[in-house]
Every structure is written in C-alpha cells, then in structure tokens.
Amino acid sequence: IAEPWDMGENGYQLGRFGGRWTEWNDRFRDGARALWHPDHRRGALQRFADLFLGSAQSFERPLQSVNFLTAHDGFTLSDLVSFDHKHNGANGEQNRDGHNHNLSHNHGAEGPTTDPLITAERERTVRALLLTLLLAQGVPMLSMGDERGHSQSGNNNAYCQDGPLSWLDWTASGNQASELEAFVRQTLTLLRRLPVLRQSRHLHTREQVSWWRVDDGVEMEAADWENPDLDALSVMLSSHQDIPGPSVTIALNIGEHDRPLRLPGECHWTLALGSAEGGTVAVLPRLSILLFQSLD
C-alpha cells in the first residue's frame, strides 16, 4: 500500500504505482468531505461520481484505490464534524504544524457542545460520510476509533502525543458510540452480502451502472450533469452473470431539503440502509444517503 505523495518536485504520484500496488486515495478523501460541507458542495456530486465508482481516472482497477475519510494524520472523523480549525497547541509549535485545508465543519460550535441540535447534525453528517466511504467501489479504509467517535480535541497532528489526547479509550461507553458501532457493523454486513458493491473491474457500460434524477426517476442527461446546483441523484448498480445477487440503487441528497424520490427502472426496491431517519422508497431526506436493493 502506497501513500503516494511526498515533498518536492514530482512528489505527488497518485495512480502511478501500478501493478499489484494499492494507494491511499486523497482525492476520494477530499471529494467525500466536500459533498457534505455547506461551503464546498456546489458541483461536488459531479466531481465525486468517478471517485464513487472506483476512480477510473486514476487507477486501472477499482481495488487499487484505498478510499478513506481520515488517517493517522489529520482530524479524526468526530473532530472533522466538530472543529472548523485545528487546535494543535499541545504540540509545542504555536499551532503552525498540521494541515490547514481540512474541509471540516463544526456545525455551529467549535468543539464539544451540549446543544442537542448541533449534536444531531454532527451525527447525521458522520453517518453520511461513513456510507459515502463504505458504499463506494474500491477498498474502504476506516481509521481505528472512528467507528466509536474517537476525538483528539481538534488536534490534527497528534504524532507527537502519547497520552490521553491520542489514546483510544476502549472502555468508554455511551449511546452515541454504541449506535455508531452498530451502524458501521450493519453496513459492513450488507457489503459482504451484496457483491455488486464490491466489484473488481471498473463499471463503464449502462448495463453495469446508470445515473438517475431523483424527482422523476428519469435517466440523467448531459444538461443534468452540467447543472452546477445539482444536489441529488441516484446511481443504480446492476447485477449480471459475473456479479450475482440483487441490484442496488444508492440515492444521495447533499441539499438542505427533503426531496421526493422515484427509484429507477422496473425493479421492486426495498430500503436496506439509510444515513438518516425518514427515508422511504418515495422520500429522500436532506443531507442523506439511502441504499436500496432489488427484490426481483
């Protein structure tokens, strides 16, 4: 596994290792974060489409792309939705160290809060980010502790910390951590059960993948992709002779309002999983991803 960037001229080498190499895909990281950030989501669906299907623009095969949201460097997932700015004072470098372009969003308060509305919005975004990662083609990498809300108090460069700031507290408990772990476990169970979500070759033909408008269930055209305000769509991944099992449709709404939903094709669909409550075969909640599987 390569971390395909380094200092200096020609240091960035994403997609150039080839062969049996897999590579951390930072374009996926930034594209996924932008989807759910209020200041960066305009045009984000168009930019993310290739990344969601395994980054064919960068890799010969989708399994060469190691998709991730967070890593050993940078914010934890909990901190990504809780801090607008890095807080690295404990590192002794006057907060000059660490990455500045984090695409993080605190949802209205910097750091921990007791505001139930802010907490609910953060949890909503965390679940949407996790489904963005786990439902994408490629190899998902989940940072240890993100599945239970691990925080480093806004420190995004904790390599020099060996104490409570960076340690994982495996004894910690609470409804929020337990519910998040259960959500991740449920998603991984579905991944194992639905081969169409784990494909080894890129999807190029309409028989494999198709994109649809959510409001009327009509297949997307060039004008839809050229709309800079596009904030919702669905993608159908079809099973076939080499990929048995149910087909799936993944519906995304990165906008601030619920949308009517009409699912594509002649299939009968059932909701398998959603990042937000209130999703049905006819309703796509705001800021959410829904996963449907075919019953045919």
Q: Model-found features: residue ranges?
A:
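Carbohydrate-interacting/catalytic domains
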Residues: 15, 113, 118-123, 127, ...
